[in-house]
């Protein structure tokens, strides 16, 4: 299986916003994401994992539609993503009711959930942030459903304020 794992893309960010080139830098981030999708298509990647913070803040509806359109250009690739601490699923978030393309699996649970991707023989585990800081070690008690499949954890965080990870318990 060929897959790409990425995180912290931060679409919508304007780094160093007081600089003259800040708007262009934000556009470059979108361009980089578009090149990633093109690379997925060219290399016939079977699974694309985005482990949080696709956006730097709550995504606008038009931004979700644009991302979903890009995902629609790679219909043979399964896409699994979750919300991170920057784009956490808060009240009023467009993430809550967004209908993704059929090749996209959005891990929208507050607790670890499993997405089985049968045609790849893969189970993908993960959760989404619903607030910017989570101090509970939510990944510690994962129960693998089928040890004979490929099991992948999509985890965002790892420090004391962002779902601490104890490697011995995973």
What do the PLM-derived regions correspond to, one by one?
Residues 47, 57-170:
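His/Asp/Glu-rich metal-coordinating catalytic cores
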Residues 1-66:
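N-terminal active-site segment of His-dependent metallophosphoesterases
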């Amino acid at each position: 299986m060929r897959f790409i794992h990425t995180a912290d893309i931060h679409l919508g960010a304007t780094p160093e916003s007081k600089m003259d080139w800040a708007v262009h830098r934000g556009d470059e981030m979108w361009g980089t994401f578009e090149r990633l999708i093109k690379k997925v298509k060219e290399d016939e990647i079977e699974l694309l994992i985005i482990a949080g913070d696709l956006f730097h803040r709550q995504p606008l509806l038009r931004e979700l539609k644009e991302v979903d359109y890009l995902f629609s250009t790679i219909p043979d690739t399964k896409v699994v993503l979750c919300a991170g601490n920057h784009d956490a699923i808060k009240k009023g978030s467009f993430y809550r009711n967004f209908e993704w393309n059929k090749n996209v699996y959005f891990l929208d649970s507050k607790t670890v959930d499993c997405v089985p991707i049968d045609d790849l023989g893969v189970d993908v585990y993960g959760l989404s942030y619903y607030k910017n800081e989570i101090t509970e070690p939510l990944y510690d008690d994962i129960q693998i459903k089928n040890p004979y499949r490929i099991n992948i954890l999509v985890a965002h965080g790892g420090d004391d304020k962002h779902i601490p990870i104890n490697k011995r318990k995973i």
